[in-house]
């Protein structure tokens, strides 16, 4: 039966689940159900066999945001708030803050974490949430077309859809790295790469920024004792690009602090093009971070770095997407590059939330991969978690994780301990070789993905990750942001690096004989015999 124009406003009963062999029974009469993603253009087949999409299209003068407002159903009763992280025995057990409060640290100076009303969410079985999230995939219905906001109840449940700032981020590709696993990793047959860099600004930072900028958009429309005039961040490149794009979409001023000459030109041009105020500072990321924290304490500028835990709520949806893409089966390993270390905790939050609410029955083991030139977490791990020391990060091709004093160190430790996780490092040569080798099997990886891949090579060599282990490598950014490092590698223009997988272009005279000589040689290298037929 064709859907009606008001289908989005309908509540729906819990559907029978294909995921559970023993469906749970409970009283749902008092519950308000979240909505499936349907819109006025949804429709089935007409009696004549033609579709009815045109008949049920929204009015021409109405956009998808206005359509969502018109068809909005009753509000659900889910909520979230800030709590100190991690909870301490000597802290105030009642300390919590509204998400509408502009606050970044607890009274003791520690981090904050977004906590959800898990009791309210748990009133619905895991099968319900699986079916709900699956029903929203591939839609343009506002705001559920986003991979983040399709899981709105797990992200920012209280925000009005009209306040959401989305560029339809997420829903990124999870692809089977068949040849890399088979030929270069000892016959791994279940190796996957989660392409978080295939997003609006080319990195996973979009997932967190849509959540943060949406909340800022909400706050700017509310009566505040201290208005928010803009949003600011320190960045190694990708955060500034994401913040600038989302602020531009919402008409909110963006201010970014960048370490001079330490990010790629592709990363630099993104905030410039999106109209942000860009400050180039003669310091490293950690120096930029100290300055932005001082500035946001004095000026009405909202802090957008991962010190602000709102971003992690969006980033955790990548973990839920992985579960969806495996039909709610849990991988054995997930390998994540780590710099400021918020992302590994975000992945843990996503997996653990799904486990706690019954969507899955376990969480994967996590691996955090660091560049050896910026490896404070690796050193802490190797000390048995007994001696953390920040450091001055050395230059690395994986510039986005060139961080020596990570804000989210405590978060990362919690995630790794809870998942029996591992920390591994990669030298500059190891990460560049891993990147090049992956590219030769069909990828176009960024250097940070190269760090994660190099960690995978090491863990396979050590026998820690098995041949048949389902393993996901998280690719955090698009390779096109880091082309100079690839150019230098294939030109063999990197000091003290062999560049063993370099594939430089071949200069050839523009005549048939010269071209044929080169191709004969190359094809012989490939083990190919060519036959030249002369007529």
Residue ranges: model-predicted function:
Residues 2-535:
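PLP-dependent amino-acid enzyme catalytic core
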């Amino acid at each position: 039966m064709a859907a009606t124009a008001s289908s989005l406003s309908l509540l729906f009963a819990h559907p029978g689940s294909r995921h559970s062999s023993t469906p749970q029974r409970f009283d749902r009469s008092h519950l308000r159900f979240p909505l499936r993603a349907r819109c006025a253009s949804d429709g089935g087949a007409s009696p004549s066999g033609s579709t009815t999409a045109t008949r049920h299209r929204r009015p021409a003068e109405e956009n998808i945001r206005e359509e969502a407002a018109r068809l909005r159903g009753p509000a659900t009763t889910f909520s979230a708030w800030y709590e100190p992280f991690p909870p301490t025995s000597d802290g105030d057990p009642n300390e919590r803050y509204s998400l509408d409060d502009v606050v970044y640290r607890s009274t003791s100076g520690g981090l904050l974490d977004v906590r959800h009303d898990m009791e309210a969410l748990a009133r619905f079985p895991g099968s319900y949430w699986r079916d709900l999230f699956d029903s929203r995939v591939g839609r343009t219905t506002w705001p559920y077309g986003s991979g983040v906001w399709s899981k709105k109840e797990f992200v920012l449940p209280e925000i009005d859809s009209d306040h959401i700032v989305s560029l339809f981020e997420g829903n990124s590709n999870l692809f089977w790295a068949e040849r890399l696993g088979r030929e270069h990793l000892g016959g791994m047959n279940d190796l996957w790469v989660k392409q978080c860099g295939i997003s609006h600004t080319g990195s996973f930072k979009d997932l967190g920024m849509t959540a943060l900028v949406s909340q800022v958009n909400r706050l700017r429309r509310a009566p505040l004792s201290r208005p928010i005039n803009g949003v600011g961040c320190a960045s190694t490149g990708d955060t500034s690009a994401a913040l600038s794009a989302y602020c531009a979409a919402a008409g909110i001023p963006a201010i970014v602090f960048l370490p001079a000459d330490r990010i790629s030109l592709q990363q630099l041009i993104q905030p410039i093009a999106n109209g942000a105020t860009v400050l180039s500072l003669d310091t490293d990321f950690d120096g930029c971070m100290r300055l932005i924290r001082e500035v946001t304490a004095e000026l009405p500028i909202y802090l957008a770095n991962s010190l602000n835990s709102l971003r992690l709520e969006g980033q955790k949806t990548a973990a839920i997407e992985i579960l969806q893409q495996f039909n709610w089966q849990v991988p054995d390993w997930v390998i994540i590059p780590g710099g400021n270390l918020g992302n590994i905790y975000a992945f843990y939050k996503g997996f653990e939330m799904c486990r706690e609410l019954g969507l899955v029955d376990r969480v994967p083991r996590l691996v955090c991969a660091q560049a050896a030139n910026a490896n404070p977490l690796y050193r802490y791990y190797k000390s048995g978690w007994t001696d953390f020391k920040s450091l001055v990060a050395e230059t690395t091709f994986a510039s986005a994780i060139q961080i020596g004093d990570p804000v989210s160190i405590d978060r990362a430790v919690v995630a790794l301990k809870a998942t029996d996780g591992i920390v591994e490092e990669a030298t500059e040569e190891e990460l560049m070789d891993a990147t090049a080798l992956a590219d030769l099997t069909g990828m176009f990886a960024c250097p940070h993905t190269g760090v994660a891949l190099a960690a995978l090579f090491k863990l396979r060599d050590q026998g820690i990750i098995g041949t048949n282990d389902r393993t996901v490598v998280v690719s955090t950014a698009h390779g096109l942001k880091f082309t100079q490092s690839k150019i230098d590698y294939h030109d063999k223009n990197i000091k003290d690096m062999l560049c063993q997988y370099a594939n430089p272009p071949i200069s050839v005279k523009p005549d048939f004989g010269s071209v044929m000589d080169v191709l004969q040689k190359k094809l012989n290298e490939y083990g190919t015999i060519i036959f030249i037929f002369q007529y």
